[in-house]
Amino acid sequence: MSVSALSPTRFADSLSGFLQVASVLGLLLLLVKAVQFYLHRQWLLKAFQQFPSPPFHWFFGHEKFKGDQELQEIVSCIENFPSAFPRWFWGSKAYLTVYDPDYMKVILGRSDPKANGAYRLLAPWIGYGLLLLNGQPWFQHRRMLTPAFHYDILKPYVKNMADSIRLMLDKWERLADQDSSIEIFQHISLMTLDTVMKCAFSHKGSVQVDGNYRTYLQAIGDLNNLFHSRVRNIFHQNDTIYKLSSNGRLAKQACQLAHDHTDGVIKLRKDQLQDEGELEKIKKKRRLDFLDILLFARMENGDSMSDKDLRAEVDTFMFEGHDTTASGVSWIFYALATHPDHQQRCREEVQSLLGDGSSITWDHLDQIPYTTMCIKEALRLYPPVPGIVRELSTSVTFPDGRSLPKGVQVTLSIYGLHHNPKVWPNPEVFDPSRFAPDSPRHSHSFLPFSGGARNCIGKQFAMSELKVIVALTLLRFELLPDPTRVPMPLARLVLKSKNGIYLHLKKLH
């Protein structure tokens, strides 16, 4: 009698054979990965042989740089490791961490792409817009969007900025009656989102009044933290493994919330442009704002900009246009709160120029030099973007003779640069005189908006907004620190505080 093909014996034999083959293939794959790990590690060790570093574990890398004290640990290395040191995330992944202005000048003067290993992890969120694009596509998008930040466009934005700021300050008037301090970042983040929506995306209402936008802000905060965690987890570099993880599922949900918001912004503006009156008004404008440029864009081949490209640019600027500014403002306020003499001098300067602040224009922004010096000094101490990463497209030799081969990834630690005692004497001291007009400094010693060809396209927009916010706030409030809640700077895509930024607000009138 023949044994059925479906008999338990035949099935068990087949399963056993399959498991044996799978085990052999699994072991072979593991062996291949181990060899790749070893070879890449040896290549990195050779590439970094001219650059000493703190001790690190052969597999786990520099564990001390992965905690909440990451920024402080980098600063602590500056004295012992001049200019730069290799930072190992794990055994086969390392970056040269740079905090020297001469090194910065060399890297930012080149056309190296953004490091694909780290920045590709942002693609599901912000797509391939200006932040992630490289080469000719980046150049085309940059050239197309630059007119959105022309002075003629920025000048009338001051009124929109002031309107958004006053809404927040009115809310603070009510909160200031309480004895407790308030966490300012959430309020400021909502206000800067309101500003960028009005200025860059032709939004007619106010997101500070509509509570629906808090969901978007929460999603952005979650994505910031999730990206930071993923970059530092060896297993989460694989997209499939990450998607199956709890963090991967959270990231997918947060991305969807962020995309729903930007899709709604794009759809609303498209619907508005269906109105012939609105369309004709826009066509007659000498310069278009950010979103209208995208909607009217024609790429060099004559086709309209794809929906995918359009949303990527909107996602990118929606995030960068509000979150970095919110970080900058929050830390500026904290710096002024902890240095009341400088705060009062700024206030007196603004009062002498603006009176009660009922009217503020573009021309006023160049007439507050001391306030501008204080803003810059706060940006030095607390740069909104603590670091950026490049991947060398060709080998490079630095001014001190040390070199790196093609393919090495370089982290430009802006936080480290700004806290480097060889660049800034007594770097932890708040000293606005560093930015006095006659104060000499290296061209690449101060980089709150990066530098070179890929610097922040909206830096003039951001600086203008910072000046308006600081000026109008100091006319209405005295900022006081909460000594029981000292903020702890935290390395993320954008500089945050682990425990929030709490201030007491004292009404002046």
From Swiss-Prot:
Indicate the enzyme's highest-level EC class. oxidoreductase
> Which phenotype arises from disrupting this gene?
Mutant mice are hypertensive due to constitutive activation of renal epithelial sodium channels and increased sodium reabsorption.
Q: Which GO terms describe its cellular component?
A: endoplasmic reticulum membrane; intracellular membrane-bounded organelle
Segments spanning the bilayer are 15-35, 121-141
The alphabetized UniProt keywords are:
Endoplasmic reticulum, Fatty acid metabolism, Heme, Iron, Lipid metabolism, Membrane, Metal-binding, Microsome, Monooxygenase, NADP, Oxidoreductase, Phosphoprotein, Transmembrane, Transmembrane helix
EC number(s) on record? 1.14.14.80
**What coarse category fits the chief subcellular location reported for this protein?**
endoplasmic reticulum
Which cofactors are reported in the record for this sequence? heme
Give the signal peptide as a residue range, or say none if absent: none
Q: Which residues bind heme?
A: E320, C456
Q: How does it sit in the membrane?
A: Multi-pass membrane protein
Q: Entry's Pfam families?
A: p450 (PF00067)
The answer to keyword Transmembrane applying to this record is: yes
Which PROSITE patterns does the UniProt record give? CYTOCHROME_P450
Phosphoserine is found on S439
- State its location(s): Endoplasmic reticulum membrane; Microsome membrane
Q: Which residues form a coiled coil?
A: none
- According to its UniProt entry, what is the function of this protein? A cytochrome P450 monooxygenase involved in the metabolism of fatty acids. Catalyzes predominantly the oxidation of the terminal carbon (omega-oxidation) of long-chain fatty acids. Acts as a major omega-hydroxylase for dodecanoic (lauric) acid in liver. In kidney, may play an important role in omega-hydroxylation of (5Z,8Z,11Z,14Z)-eicosatetraenoic acid (arachidonate) to 20-hydroxyeicosatetraenoic acid (20-HETE), a signaling molecule acting both as vasoconstrictive and natriuretic with overall effect on arterial blood pressure.
This chain belongs to the protein called Cytochrome P450 4A10
